Amino acid sequence: MMAVAAAQKNREMFAIKKSYSIENGYPSRRRSLVDDARFETLVVKQTKQTVLEEARSKANDDSLEDCIVQAQEHIPSEQDVELQDEHANLENLPLEEYVPVEEDVEFESVEQEQSESQSQEPEGNQQPTKNDYGLTEDEILLANAASESSDAEAAMQSAALVVRLKEGISSLGRILKAIETFHGTVQHVESRQSRVEGVDHDVLIKLDMTRGNLLQLIRSLRQSGSFSSMNLMADNNLNVKAPWFPKHASELDNCNHLMTKYEPDLDMNHPGFADKVYRQRRKEIAEIAFAYKYGDPIPFIDYSDVEVKTWRSVFKTVQDLAPKHACAEYRAAFQKLQDEQIFVETRLPQLQEMSDFLRKNTGFSLRPAAGLLTARDFLASLAFRIFQSTQYVRHVNSPYHTPEPDSIHELLGHMPLLADPSFAQFSQEIGLASLGASDEEIEKLSTVYWFTVEFGLCKEHGQIKAYGAGLLSSYGELLHAISDKCEHRAFEPASTAVQPYQDQEYQPIYYVAESFEDAKDKFRRWVSTMSRPFEVRFNPHTERVEVLDSVDKLETLVHQMNTEILHLTNAISKLRRPF
């Protein structure tokens, strides 16, 4: 489908290619999911604006050049003169004898309306003015996809358009006439009354057409005052401008590996900045993660004595503090990991054995990461019950603090709670909510993740306990978080999502959940207010995320639920039988 190619091109065009550094506008020296999301939103906006401006400028230049060439090359021939004379004679005929042929596509002039709407368009996606050759974001993405090859541009392919009609369903005839003019074939038409103010009907049109003709169709329809907006759709009825997200666990291989320097090389304040051996070690482990593909066994890391020493120092501290300050779910999982000889102070656990443990308990698994994922891609992984984990170890000179997540933070902070069913479900809910979310919503989700999964507190028998990985792997902030030196607020996703975050010192505010179940319920209600126009679910049997965008898919899901309910009903009946 041509729109799929356009959607893929969208992801390539707006990939993060800047180093995550202060020099490029990164908001702090310490890497965090929240700052990553903010930085990525800024860079994507800047990149999108630049790409669109360049494409529009090129289109304007090409159009002007074509006009000049045509003017220079067109010298009236005798045949042209004869045709002009014939046309003049026709115009002099009486009205009843001459009826002009209607244009294939006739649209009203709406220069004033376009001018008014431009001020409301987001930056980088403005409608073109009358002096602009005029390329919308849809057209630029489609044009880039079509430019892959001449065969692709000329081949007849399928597309889907959603057009919003301002003047009623009668405008549909003009759309169908335009499609016929550009040699398209309509396969499906569906309309409904619009929920958007000022719009009468929404119309979905599925058609077959070449990419070149589709571009011309979009440009023609866009100029009509009868249509409020028009969107080119990709698979699953998603707008091609919507952020790409993986549909299967294997597609996590396509997540953006950021083009950035390694943190020890970047920051003079990094504990390993002056240690060449440590910097080389970090680079080697990062390259292992870069080479990993879906289905591969997680590479074995032969940790050095120095790295094991660092692990031992942090492990013993957590072992001492957890019984008193960690939540019950964390303590139970920690004990289970010790019983299975995965958590021992004499060696670092390998990600493969930890992944096997999690899969057995909650269905979560691990995937090695270089620590260089976008916030969007990291959250997307959680939707598949996959946690992207680093394998490098913090510098030995700073065992109780690291400027970025390392394997000790992942192992001691995140892994135990990912073995708890309720917390694992909460983590996956955050991941599912991120799929197809806007950049601004990714910022909010990252902030919620930060104040819960990383620095969250919960109530337990009237006392405050920690469940955040950042707290459980950093005893200094753990003691601060449970003290009276900071403010404790009840967890409410709407307010948590906009809470400012700072990384220069310990947080002044922490959010306290009544329980994981309560946190999940509140989170689900908040997610339902997000702008994403579709719902998704994870199918654990196929490791695939399904977009619930059709009656057929909903019917299939209902049948599956009925089967599960039947099993539950049978189980209850058997339990009620007398011995």
Curated annotation (Swiss-Prot):
Pathway linked to the protein: Catecholamine biosynthesis; dopamine biosynthesis; dopamine from L-tyrosine: step 1/2
InterPro entries listed in its UniProt record: ACT-like_dom_sf (IPR045865), ArAA_hydroxylase (IPR001273), ArAA_hydroxylase_Fe/CU_BS (IPR018301), ArAA_hydroxylase_sf (IPR036951), Aro-AA_hydroxylase_C_sf (IPR036329), Aromatic-AA_hydroxylase_C (IPR019774), Eu_TyrOH_cat (IPR041903), Tyr_3_mOase (IPR005962)
Annotated keywords: Catecholamine biosynthesis, Cell projection, Cytoplasm, Iron, Metal-binding, Monooxygenase, Neurotransmitter biosynthesis, Oxidoreductase
Disordered: annotated segments: 105-132
GO biological process: adult chitin-containing cuticle pigmentation; adult locomotory behavior; catecholamine metabolic process; courtship behavior; cuticle pigmentation; developmental pigmentation; dopamine biosynthetic process; dopamine biosynthetic process from tyrosine
Biased composition (Acidic residues): 105-114
The EC number(s) this enzyme carries: 1.14.16.2
Record localization: Cytoplasm, Perinuclear region; Cell projection, Axon
Activity control summary: Phosphorylation leads to an increase in the catalytic activity.
Reactions catalysed according to its record: (6R)-L-erythro-5,6,7,8-tetrahydrobiopterin + L-tyrosine + O2 = (4aS,6R)-4a-hydroxy-L-erythro-5,6,7,8-tetrahydrobiopterin + L-dopa
Cofactors: Fe(2+)
SUPFAM superfamilies assigned to the protein according to its UniProt record, in alphabetical order: ACT-like, Aromatic aminoacid monoxygenases, catalytic and oligomerization domains
A cellular component term, taken from the record's GO annotations: cytoplasm
Binding residues for Fe cation: H409, H414, E454
Gene Ontology molecular function terms on file: iron ion binding; tyrosine 3-monooxygenase activity
Role played: Plays an important role in the physiology of adrenergic neurons.
Family: Belongs to the biopterin-dependent aromatic amino acid hydroxylase family.
PANTHER family membership: AROMATIC AMINO ACID HYDROXYLASE, TYROSINE 3-MONOOXYGENASE
NCBIfam families per record: Tyr_3_monoox (TIGR01269)
The protein, known as: Tyrosine 3-monooxygenase
